[in-house]
Curated annotation (Swiss-Prot):
Keywords: Heme, Iron, Metal-binding, Oxygen transport, Transport. One of its GO terms (biological process) is oxygen transport. Red blood cells. Gene3D superfamilies: Globins. One of its GO terms (molecular function) is heme binding. CDD domains: Hb-beta-like. Pfam families: Globin. It comes from Pseudaphritis urvillii (Congolli). This is Hemoglobin subunit beta-1. GO terms for cellular component: blood microparticle; haptoglobin-hemoglobin complex; hemoglobin complex. Hb1 is a heterotetramer of two alpha chains and two beta-1 chains. Involved in oxygen transport from gills to the various peripheral tissues. Belongs to the globin family.
Amino acid sequence: VVWTNEERSIISSIFSNLDYDDIGPKALCRCLIVYPWTQRHFTTFGNLYTPEAIMTNSKVAEHGVKVLHGLDRAVKNMDNIKATYYDLSILHSEKLHVDPDNFKLLSDCLTIVVAAKMGSGFTPETQAAFQKFLAVVVSALGKQYH
C-alpha cells in the first residue's frame, strides 16, 4: 500500500484526537448490537442478551479500548501493517476462529462512531483515508485465512 503524506496526516490526526475509552467501547457495542451473530466470539464476556446489557458490560468496554490500542499499532507502522498484525491474525484465525468478515463489520461500526464524533470534520477526504487505513488493517487481520 502506498500512503500519501495527506493520508498519513489524516490518519495520525484522527487517532491522536480519539478518546479510546469512549470510541472503542461505542464501536464494539454497536457491532455486537447491530450484528448479533458476532456475539458468539465473546461468550466469556457474560450477559450480552440486550443492547443495554452490552452497553454496560465492562468486558465489552475493555475490549473496545484494546481494539483501538491495536489500531494504534497500525498507525505507528503504516508501512508494514501486515507484519504488524501477523501474530494477531494467527490468533484470530487459528485459536479464536473469528470469521474474517467480522473485522469489516467492526471497521464499519468504528467508521460510524468516528464520523459521529468528528461531525463536519469527517469530510469525504477524511473518510477516504480512514476507510483505506481500515481496509488495510482488515486485510492484514484476515491474512492467515487465505
